[in-house]
Amino acid sequence: KQGNKKDSFEPGIELLGKVTVFAEGCRGHLGKQLIKNFELNKGKDPQQYGIGFKEIWEIEDKNHEEGLVMHTAGWPLDNSTYGGSFMYHAENKQIFLGYVIGLDYKNPHLSPYDEFQRFKTHPAIKKIIEGGKRISYGARALIEGGFQSLPKMFMPGALLVGCDAGTLNMPKIKGSHTAMKSGMIAAETINEHLKENKNLSIYDEKFKS
């Protein structure tokens, strides 16, 4: 309480490195501070955010078609709110069902979770999950500004990767792919930086090429 050290006190550990990679995900606590302090988003469009819900269902065999992919846009949202869904038929009679809604919606009474539940009442969705059971669920924030909102991803002694930078490609619905690729390019960049003394700015060039 008074700031006095007890016998069990352990000082914090200093982790030192020539290059630090920040990979905290969407709007990471440290990442957003770095973007602000180093003005990494100067001249870029404002970032956009969304919330995504995902459920894993085990459905009846007659409703399952392994490999089937379904994407939708709009309903049940109105014309002033953007969002859409995905459904992937996986193996073992499982489907991955989800809905994403932009967080710039104007209606203060809109509940993204309730809209997702309403979406599941659509006949095309209801007939697939009817008789099945939900076995897992989750939600996460998404960074959706795209290429025009992508900040500089390098700064002195550090790199941003994945959603900490905003690498999600919304038009192609590619998030994990671009995040992993940014990590691979970050590793290549650090290797060249340490071995050949190349500037960390090559990370941006490599990622955008």
Predicted segments with their positions:
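FAD-binding beta-loop-beta segment adjacent to the flavin cofactor pocket
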Residues: 139-170, 201
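Alpha-helix capping and helix-loop boundary segments enriched in small/acidic/polar residues
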Residues: 44, 107, 149-152, 170-178, ...
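Predominantly flavin-linked oxidoreductase catalytic cores and closely associated redox partners
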Residues: 1-127, 185
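Extended, hydrophobic alpha-helical segments in both membrane/secreted and soluble proteins
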Residues: 154, 160-164, 176-190
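Active-site-proximal substrate-binding core of FAD-dependent oxidoreductases
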Residues: 166-172, 184-209
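Domain-scale detector for complete catalytic domains at protein termini or as standalone homologs
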Residues: 3, 132-133, 138-142, 206
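Flexible, glycine/charged-enriched surface loops at secondary-structure junctions
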Residues: 127-138, 196-202
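Conserved alpha/beta core surface patches that mediate binding of polyanionic ligands
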Residues: 71-83, 138-151
